[in-house]
Regions:
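Betabetaalpha-Me/HNH-type nuclease active-site subdomain
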Residues: 1-77
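Structured segments of extracytoplasmic/periplasmic soluble domains
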Residues: 37-45, 60-61, 75-82, 92, ...
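Short, well-ordered coil↔helix boundary/capping segments
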Residues: 66, 80-87
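C-terminal, well-folded lobe of enzymatic/effector domains
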Residues: 9, 14, 84-150
């Protein structure tokens, strides 16, 4: 699931280098063939394929393997658990890693956990994820309960 080239010591030459993700990405046709196989395996009609993204459980920008089958999955594009939000969370986490405010391991753990907690509880100005329980989503639920209480 992880790219062995990306370590805490190599982040300046890998994920923090502009253009890194594009440089290591497999050809588009190869990725689309994999997506088509996954859609078929799940019984999703090819006509509905545009509603789904080929997701990397650990995004390339956080040291995930660009092409390992164990790192690939499907996510809907839209919604609270959608790829659009996950991609934004990954970019925020990458910024924090590259600024030295989070370790690579912390960012990877956050994105493979309940990453939607990171998306909703993460501040653009702060890289503090210590209050976010990415394993259970507890902080996210507490915040939602407070906002709906009379």
């Amino acid at each position: 699931m992880l790219d062995e080239r990306v370590t805490q010591q190599s982040i300046r030459e890998t994920i923090c280098r502009p253009g890194y993700a594009s440089a290591v990405a497999p050809p588009f046709d190869e990725l689309m063939a994999h997506k088509d196989r996954m859609l078929a395996e799940r019984g999703i009609d090819a006509d509905d394929g545009a509603d789904f993204a080929l997701d990397r459980r650990v995004p390339v920008v956080l040291g995930g393997s660009p092409d390992a089958p164990s790192n690939l999955g499907l996510l809907p594009w839209a919604g609270r658990q959608g790829e659009r939000r996950k991609a934004r969370a990954a970019v925020m986490l990458k910024r924090c890693v590259c600024e030295g405010k989070l370790s690579l391991a912390e960012a990877q753990a956050a994105i493979v956990g309940d990453w939607s907690v990171v998306y909703s509880g993460f501040s653009q100005a702060s890289c503090d994820i210590s209050r976010l329980d990415v394993a259970t989503g507890a902080e996210n639920r507490r915040r939602a309960e407070r906002s709906t209480s009379p």
